[in-house]
Amino acid sequence: MARQEDLFKKLIAHCKEYGFVFPSSEIYDGLSAVYDYGQYGVELKNNLKRYWWDGMTLLHDNIVGIDAAIFMHPTVWKASGHVDAFNDPLIDNRDSKKRYRADVLIEDHLAKIDEKISREVEKAAKKFGDSFDEAMFRSTNPRVAKHQAERDAIHERFARAMNANDLDELRQIIIDCEIVCPLSGTRNWTDVRQFNLMFATEMGSTADGAMKVYLRPETAQGIFVNFLNVQKTGRMKIPFGIAQIGKAFRNEIVARQFIFRMREFEQMEMQFFVRPGEELAWFARWKEARMRWHRNLGLGDAKYRFHDHEKLAHYANAATDIEYEMPFGFKEVEGIHSRTNFDLSQHEKFSGKKIQYFDAELGTSYTPYVIETSIGVDRLFLSILAGAYTEETLDGGESRVVLKLPPALAPIKLAVLPLVRKDGLAEKAEEILHMLRFDFRCQYDEKDSIGKRYRRQDAIGTPYCITVDYDTMRDDTVTIRFRDTMEQERVSIDRLHEIISDRVSLRSLLEGLK
């Protein structure tokens, strides 16, 4: 665990040092849980969004996109339940004056019990080797059985309390489990209370005439209120989907773990509208399709897992998370939910407008059911960096840090490097750069030794480095170096476009989804 925490700190430092992520307003000492994306971060983020957008709207004839406004009529959020129920249960430690989410404190305690069980299993696996039967060990070992029984009892109480919105019971679980404040080490807790997460502001020129509005806490409602607009103007037939990428805002009291949980963040959501009664079959299909999309990135299938929800939101009849193994444990990067017809029904009720679909095949009108896929772009960004960040020791004891990003997502696709700045090599390198830059995001670098320049490109994840040397001036060939293997190949300049295009195009990534 300590090693993973150290790795996470290195990753955060790497993001700042190499222009991926900066603390926002840093010259004013920053703003808690708010970050800016730097010159390489914004390119990686845009490439991720393009991979998702094309995977949805380009590869599916029945999915289209919209871009809804951040400000919406305040009744939208009343209808969706956000005004009354978009809350977090908060608890304060009287000694440290620190505020925590009560549910997160309990979840962290459960995770510690899981770690105890995992350590017991790992020790036994090393002891017994190939003959080890994990299932039998878990069911028969007294220590594991004790930990599991403790965990199950706490989890059952926790689930009941969350479902019943029982704040007193949440506090009692914290007391009974002897959960301490990480800062003060004491158990001097206040009562648990609810805190609404929406940012409110006013729209209008005078205080008396101003309307209270909200920064949207999710992008989904912009899709639901535009259901009829898109369906009618696009002549869409069910099943069909509407996709959107956009900013959302939540007044997170406990924002932590770098860009994993922020107050301003970006979502990629797709709402898929289906016939009532067919939603669970579509939920299963989208569940597998979304996992395939993530694993297609090549970061390792074992790094991903499903986490099915035991506690369902009031509007859902099925829900699962796709989790990725971050340096701080498995965490959600995407949610897939069967939202039933709750959202459209609520907006029909509050707006007084009929929001239904006439199904010509069935000869009847109905309120469609919805399957939602929802990704936090910033979380996805962090998972990609965590999976790509690699420290290597090379022959001769030299080391390097390399971001083994999927080539199609890399911020810079290729770097053009003259071996030296004299004898026309720099001019030749710039000529090659201008030839390629209309199709690829390129970088030119002539400063420092060629080895140091390779290391800089490795650190930002550039898949290819093209070296222009004296042989180039004689026979129009260059050396092309691949980031992951550091292998070098001599190729003619007129083949560069063909070689690089095949390996870094988004198409090469999208074809893996077929």
Predicted regions span which residues?
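NTP/phosphate- and nucleic-acid-binding module
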Residues: 1-514
